[in-house]
Amino acid sequence: MEEGSSTARAVVRSTCGFTVGLSLATAFGLLELLGEGHSPFGCLVTTVTLAAFLSLGMGFSRQVRVSVLLLLPQAFSKQSRLLLLVASFGLVLQGPCANTLQNFTRASEAVACGAELALNQTAEMLERAKQPLISALSKIKAIAQKAKVVGDRIRKFFRSIIDAVKHIARCLQNVWYWLLHIGDMCNSELGNPYSKCTQVFDDAKIHCMKVVSGFPHLCYALLPYKLLVCGLASLVQKFCVLPSYLEFFLRTVIRTPVMKLLGKLRREFEFNMTATHYFSVDLNSSRSLSQVALDLQEAVSMKLYTAREALSLMGYTMPLLIGFLYIQALCYRYYYLNSDKFDNVYITRRFLDMEAVRSLAGMPTVLPLSSHEAKHYIQPDSMFLSQREQMFYTLEIFNLTRHLLIMLLLVFLDYGVFWLLDLARYHLQGEIVARSPVVVSISVEGSGYSGNIYRDLASAFDVMQQGNVSVLSPRCTLHPSEPDAKGYIVIGTMYGLCFFVTLFGSYVSRLRRAICASYYPSREQERITYLYNMLLSHRTNITATVQRAVRRRSADQGQMNILQVLAIRLPFLRPLLGPFSLQQSYCMGCGEPEDKGGMENFVSCSTPGCRGLYCPTCFRLLNNTCSVCSAPLSNQGHLDLELDSSDEESPQLWLAAARRKAPEQELKLRQQLQEALGTNLSDKSTSKPERAGNRNQDRKQ
């Protein structure tokens, strides 16, 4: 019967685990598909793989079941909160930030389109501005062509005249050459008659002198004949000189005037016609303005490639989060099973049962906890947080607030950019065309080449005035990208989940211990025993520490601090030093001031003349015994009775406490004190401590 019930429980447990595993895998797949926006095929593969692991693991493996159950409260841990914030910020980067970048991209494209449109219209205006000059240039070219035809005809006519003149010149040149060479031919044929004649007589004279060398004077008789005969021969020489005189006459009278006349005739037909046209427009550009803008966008995209890849990884934060949380759950299970100190700060029901058993058996107990212990050890169902949890709670709230401010700033930036661009789109929609307000017409009258040129120029300027310039065109209309309202809802949900995890994470994280305790009860009992023994040993050490603190403060109580000395020495400073509570009382064990706990919560020693004042916790740790006056009677410590002979107050307090607590020990204590001090202690001196004690009681009341 018992075996059948255990088998039924195992079957139910496996069935529930299998169902829970399938449900968790299905929820994860829907979150990936609808929340993260992944591809359906990838979500299907991931969901099927995760469902196989979770369903089979939770159905048939105790370890997997514990790890998955630990995964749920582990989602409220510090690391999971951090990953949730990272995932939420990833949604912000993929939503508002990406939309802001998209709006800036569309704005830059619209600006580039407008700039290219303006450039094209500028080129069109330049073409229109060139039309008058081109028309004038065509007329000038036509005039030049006609002038060239006339010039060709004049050139032919002039060439005919030049040919005729050249023919006449060649005839005259032949005559000229004949006259020029006729003298040379005459001289070459006839020679120089006078020279030849004188040469003959000179040769005869020389020959005569050779023949009649004895009578050379006879040879001089030929001289008169020489002069006569050679003078007649010089008349023949005049005939050869006539051509040279005729050549000079022809050069000066005929050749020079004829050449001047021909040059003057040529200059009459010479003319220059120059047409100069200067029109230079430099618009050298290898790429259009839109191509330049696209190149700039491509360069910026290359620079931001690493950042875009990092942003793309934000879409896989959910699988990374689940994997990290599962590893954290495995680590928690491992440390729970192997470390007694790990997360062992809870006063559970089993701890209280152990406390009750020890109390009934008369053994030392640890409850109630001290104020210091209560800050570190709490009950699992308590609404109060431990000191460590409070510190982490404050830090997480501050961190979440910082992330919320950054998220709101990015969301407002996205909406602000869209609002500005949409406002610009609303006011710049339509088409604006700039037209000439006044059309001026110019009429040119007259005929001829100049009139035609001026008339063409005027008509070209009429064409320019009729042109229109598009200032705003629908082709460059700005279309900003609207913010995704659904994305805002998802982001708000994620940050709301982060806030919920931060607010209740410390409470939900306590369920991890409960889950492990339900699956490992023997291990939980070991941890509770360790915690109880640690508190008990710590409590014993605390008692000795409190006793030493009481003795130290009792010895220092008669001394005054610097503020008290100043108040006594300088009375006018007392109003200023009054707020510092110069006469403030405090617990002699832990030093807690009376204004924190209230004087009604403090316990004063009932021994007359004793200044002992304790908080309830310290008084309970001292077993409701004053360590100032009852120290020699305590079983927990032994005082060193090394007293000065002038110290009479402490022995009297000890004797009074012994008389009140154990009268039979008074005589024994008196003997020990007399041996230590070397003097006799009489009962007369007790009146002074009693009066001092009464005054002390009156002051405390």
Swiss-Prot record:
Cell location: Cytoplasmic vesicle, Secretory vesicle, Acrosome membrane
Keyword Transmembrane helix carried by entry: yes
Pfam families: DC_STAMP (PF07782)
Biased composition (Basic and acidic residues): 685-701
InterPro entries: CSR-E3_Ligase_Protein, DC_STAMP-like
Membrane topology: Multi-pass membrane protein
One Gene Ontology CC term in the entry: acrosomal membrane
Keyword flag Transmembrane: yes
Biological process according to GO: fusion of sperm to egg plasma membrane involved in single fertilization; sperm-egg recognition
Domain of life: Eukaryota
Principal location listed in the UniProt entry: membrane
Tissue: Expressed in testis.
Residues glycosylated per entry: 272, 284, 468
Disordered, as annotated region: 673-701
Keywords for the protein's UniProt record, in alphabetical order: Cytoplasmic vesicle, Glycoprotein, Membrane, Transmembrane, Transmembrane helix
Transmembrane segments: 15-35, 40-60, 82-102, 215-235, 310-330, 404-424, 488-508
Record text on subunit structure and interactions: Interacts with DCST1.
Function according to Swiss-Prot or TrEMBL: Essential sperm cell-surface protein required for sperm-egg fusion and fertilization.
Protein name: DC-STAMP domain-containing protein 2
Gene name tied to this protein: Dcst2
